[in-house]
A protein has these predicted regions:
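Ribonuclease/tRNase effector modules and their secretory precursors
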Residues: 1-96
Length: 96
C-alpha cells in the first residue's frame, strides 16, 4: 500500500499524520479517518486536552486519553520534537 504524510504545525509543535491510498476513490486520505473516522484536527485537539497519558514500552509509543473529547491517541516522537500521530479513535471510559 502506498503512503504519504501530511504535516500540521500548531503551537510550535509539528504533527505528522500518515495518509493511505483509498482503494475505492484512488485518492489519499488520513489513515486515522479511514480506520476510525477521527480527523487529524480532532487527534491534535485531544493531544492538547489530554486527561491521562502513559508510555507503552512494548509498542514504543505514548497513549493518551482526552475525557473531554472521548478520544484515545497513540503517538511517538520523531527528531525529539516532531510528533507522529499513529492513530486515534473514540473510546469512552477507558481510564475512569
Amino acid at each position: 500500500m502506498e503512503h504519504k504524510y501530511q504535516i500540521f504545525k500548531i503551537k510550535e509543535k509539528k504533527f505528522i499524520v500518515k495518509m493511505d491510498l483509498n482503494p475505492l476513490t484512488n485518492e489519499f486520505e488520513y489513515h486515522m479517518y479511514l480506520r476510525h473516522l477521527i480527523t487529524p484536527q480532532q487527534a491534535i485537539a485531544a493531544y492538547f486536552s489530554k486527561t491521562y497519558e502513559t508510555f507503552n514500552p512494548e509498542r514504543n509509543r505514548y497513549e493518551l486519553y482526552s475525557k473531554s473529547l472521548n478520544i484515545t491517541v497513540y503517538y511517538t516522537y520523531l527528531k525529539e520534537k516532531d510528533i507522529l500521530l499513529i492513530t486515534a479513535f473514540y473510546q469512552g471510559g477507558q481510564y475512569e
